[in-house]
Amino acid sequence: MNHIRLTMAQALVKFLDQQYVELDGREHKFVNNIFGVFGHGCVVGVGQALQQGGHHIRFLQGKNEQNMALAATAFAKQKDRLEIIPCVSSIGPGAMNMVTAAGCATANRIPLLLLPGDTFACRQPDPVLQQAEFFDSYGRTVTDAFRGVCHYFDRLERPEQLMTAALHAMRVLTDPADTGAVCLAMPQDVEGEAFDYPEAFFRKRVWHQDRRLITDGQLARALEILRAARHPMAILGGGVRYSQAGAEFAALCEKHQIPFGETQAGKGTLPFDLPMNMGGIGVTGGQAANRVAQQADVVLAVGTRLSDFTTSSKWLFGDNCKFITLNICPFDTIKMDAEPLLCDAKAGLDALDQGLEGYRSGWDEAALKATRQAWLNKVEEFYDDRRPQGLSQTRALGIINRFMQKSDIAMGAAGSLPGDMQRLWQSGDSGTYHMEYGFSNMGYETNGALGVKLAAPEREVYSFFGDGTYLMAHSELLTCVQENLRVHFCLFDNSGWGCIENLQNNQGCDTFGTVFRRRNPETGELDGPVLPVDFAANARSYGLLAFTIRTEEELLSALEAGRNQPLPVLYDIKVLPGSMTPGFDSWWRVGVAEVSEMERVQQAYQEQQNHIQSVREF
């Protein structure tokens, strides 16, 4: 066997350059880019390996470690998990900045490879710059924090350990059932240490994602339940998208008259105007899907984690409603006391469709149509919500939705906009709705937009977020300028955390700490004037084109101008506080105070206790 002498970092880059994923006979190169924020813990190791060349991986310069890792997460999500962008950081604070992004990727079942620098394996110069010492164990470093948010963690304390570590990292990253964040911590001395690696380690390696088929026993049990159902419903989760099973899902629902609701991750897989599409389901869902859910006697949940926002904290469905969960991940199949179908979504849906030949549900077709149309009428009311005081949030959203083309991508993650968008947004082509709502990570929108644009450079990308998110994290706006990427950043400025203020008020609390106001010297509280911020000026300082918008006319004019020039654009849209959509036929369990001197809080607690009497306990 022939060998080649390389540093560990050089070998890592060479290995990543030869990784491919195959799905349905089509190969996808798994790594074409790598993000990095260089520091002393990586610049002369991985940085040197990247600079030296001899590979086909492009370096992308992140501006903040968390934010570039969020961009990498969004990239992999938009690529249906068939390509990733690894992220390199220095040690200490640079490494720690990526922990949040790791949690985001793992919560959403998205592959993310993190390569943080670490302290010296030899320990000779300890304690080194940016090293935190732990008195209980010399072997512990801050990168151990990744263990709690990653599906695979390893620390490379010898250069030859790369071979087993890299293979196991790829095993997890390419496994649809077990994917999430992966961390390979790299002691900075080991990055530069050389080893005679076997050339076979660097051969082209194809990871095959063979579709897992449904077993005969599982299929028979599911068909027995479905055929006995009069009012079945389906839930379209993100797994349908990642399995590229939208056509099979639509065919099953249309053929057998099974209405369906969409999760945040599943929305946009199918057009909004399909007759069986009842829209968003759950806490941030709409009236149509939630009312159908309350009447359903069987629910077929496909590719969904069944989070509290989908099930309304397990309150939405009737006591006698049975669940069938079709999922590639065993962990998800037993939720809601379901009959499990452990298989690929496309393969499982096709088998169910064939097995249900001749079956059609007992739903009244006219009633379903009326329920759906009533909700569409409500959507139009929100989109046409004109107010003399200024722009409402839903009116601005509607203007942008109607302006965008079917191929344009809309994305978001946190605040009140995800609720508005799951309820109201009318998606175009498949894959044009990109919502991170597993972790609802503030900052994903502003930075993830970079990743989405890198994944789909031929499409226009519109990112939706509030002023709270922008203030928290927006460093990769500059990277969009650097990479000549036109991204449309739609900032809805309501002077605070409007979503949380709304929750606060709905649970009996007065507004407190959720609006951006000056400290009042007379009261000592944050109840002074609202803090005015010129976000457009801030964006211009980075090199973006930017508009300040207060009227419908200004918004339409800015949208037109934004599409006809090469720069990334920020639309600073001043919207009326509290002008988001309310909830519809749903409930969400939160930690309301059991004891309080505030009467409205006492009432909110009692209302919650009443709802708890109607929930499923598991």
What are these regions (language model features)?
Residues 61, 186, 262, 412-414, ...:
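Pocket-edge structural micro-motifs
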Residues 123-136, 333-334, 342, 349-350, ...:
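Thiamine diphosphate
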Residues 150-153, 379, 383, 546:
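Short amphipathic alpha-helical interaction patches enriched in hydrophobic/aromatic residues
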Residues 37-46, 372-453:
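Active-site diphosphate/adenylate-binding microenvironment
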Residues 2-362, 399, 403-406, 486-489, ...:
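N-terminal alpha/beta PP-like core and its mobile active-site loop of ThDP/TPP-dependent enzymes
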Residues 157-160, 183, 198, 224, ...:
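Phosphate/pyrophosphate-binding active-site segments
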Residues 31-32, 85-87, 128, 207-208, ...:
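A short, structure-level motif marking secondary-structure boundaries and short turns
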Residues 6, 10, 28, 243, ...:
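Conserved structured core elements
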